[in-house]
């Protein structure tokens, strides 16, 4: 296999060349101020990781939310941009800090407005333009639940996850923020590059991609009715509580596009075990809810095309990581730290899913045997 580049960072960002303003609403973020300022600790605290960062963050939390911080941990690893803060009085919060202040402001504003309409997202406790503290969502990651569930249980929890995304879409419309967030994936070059990932994988394995009507694919993917979408709606970004309620966190990549994109991001992730019957049933049930007024035939065509290309994007990212890291990754570590699914079964399952979704749409049905060939070549890596 020759070197394989991935366009996934641009795909996730939602633009190729021209970054757009992250929030066009009028209201500005304001930090919450605690009425009681906690005096500094009399003795230095001992932190397990990143002591200087933890000292500063603990002081910030205490100044604005009161109480005494007893512990700060990094469940996803110390290289991640989020950590868990614990107070002596039992309170907890998730602290996140984004490299791009525009994305931080976007995330805070979207969560603020969605919370006004009881959407299943965390409540913001504090924000100062860089650091955001939000409520801790109790439960288990959706990706972990899916890995350990049988087919009926997977159908149930995926249906709950799709219902919660639909609830978020409705809340965004009520809040009037569809036009306040940036349009993502609207550049023609961005869409063309997304489609080209097929050729990159084909070139890497020396398996020519069948001829496709790229102009029609491009037209299908143009977001002509942009609405708020989470966009990065991976199962790893959802928490399921004891009642089965699914809540969504990590909103820095949200924007305005086709609501069906959230359905695609969820169902076409490599952490979702492939089951054609389950996915067909979910598409039948939820495509009408995510269609946003489009005729069902048009909505199903969009879902099929976007789903095939999303599987391709995830596959390209996985193969790029596999080559760069010189091998497949540990499955349990992937689940524990919400890493990309760089395993042979997950890569091949993306091929199976892409072929299955392609079989439903004439514009991409020629890719069915091609994905089977790719899956066979992946076996040799």
State the predicted function of each range.
Residues 3, 7-11, 26:
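Intrinsic-disorder-associated, low-complexity terminal segments enriched in Asp/Asn/His/Tyr and depleted
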Residues 8, 15, 20, 36-71:
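Juxta-kinase regulatory segment immediately upstream of eukaryotic protein kinase catalytic domains
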Residues 74-87, 215-261:
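Active-site acidic catalytic loop and adjacent metal/ATP-binding pocket
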Residues 79-180:
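ATP-binding pocket architecture of kinase catalytic cores
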Residues 150-151, 247, 264-266:
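Glycine-rich, phosphate-binding/catalytic loops in enzymes
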Residues 150-205, 226, 255, 329-330:
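A cross-family kinase active-site recognition segment
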Residues 260-295, 306-328:
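Active-site activation/catalytic loop segments of kinase-like enzymes and analogous catalytic loops
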Residues 312-381:
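ATP/Mg2+ or Mg2+-diphosphate-binding catalytic cores
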């Amino acid at each position: 296999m020759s070197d394989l580049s991935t366009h996934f960072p641009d795909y996730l960002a939602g633009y190729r060349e021209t970054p757009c303003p992250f929030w066009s609403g009028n209201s500005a973020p304001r930090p919450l101020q605690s009425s009681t300022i906690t005096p500094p600790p009399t003795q230095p605290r001992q932190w397990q990781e990143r002591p200087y960062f933890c000292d500063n963050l603990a002081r910030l939390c205490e100044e604005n939310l009161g109480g005494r911080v007893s512990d700060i941990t990094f469940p996803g690893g110390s290289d991640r941009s989020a950590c868990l803060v614990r107070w002596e009085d039992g309170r907890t919060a998730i602290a996140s800090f984004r490299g791009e202040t525009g994305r931080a402001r976007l995330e805070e504003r979207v969560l603020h407005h969605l919370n006004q309409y009881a959407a299943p997202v965390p409540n913001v406790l504090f924000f100062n333009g860089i650091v955001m503290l939000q409520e801790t969502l109790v439960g288990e990651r959706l990706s972990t639940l899916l890995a350990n569930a049988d087919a009926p249980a997977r159908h149930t929890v995926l249906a709950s996850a799709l219902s919660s995304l639909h609830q978020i879409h409705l809340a965004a419309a009520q809040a009037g923020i569809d036009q306040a967030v940036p349009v993502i994936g609207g550049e023609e070059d961005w869409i063309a590059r997304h489609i080209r990932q097929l050729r990159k994988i084909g070139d890497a394995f020396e398996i020519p991609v069948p001829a496709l009507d790229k102009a029609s694919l491009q037209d299908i993917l143009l977001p002509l009715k942009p609405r708020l979408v989470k966009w990065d709606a991976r199962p790893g970004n959802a928490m399921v509580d004891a009642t089965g309620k699914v809540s969504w966190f990590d909103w820095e990549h949200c924007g305005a596009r086709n609501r069906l994109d959230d359905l695609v991001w969820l169902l076409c992730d490599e952490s979702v075990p492939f089951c054609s019957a389950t996915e067909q049933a979910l598409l039948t049930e939820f495509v009408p809810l995510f269609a946003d007024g489009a005729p069902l035939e048009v909505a199903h065509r969009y879902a099929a095309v976007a789903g095939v290309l999303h599987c391709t994007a995830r596959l390209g990212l996985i193969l790029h990581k596999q080559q760069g890291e010189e091998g497949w990754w540990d499955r349990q570590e992937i689940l524990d730290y919400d890493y990309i699914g760089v395993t042979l079964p997950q890569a091949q399952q993306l091929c199976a899913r892409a072929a299955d979704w392609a079989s439903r749409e004439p514009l991409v049905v020629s890719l069915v045997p091609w994905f089977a060939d790719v899956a066979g070549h992946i076996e040799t890596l």
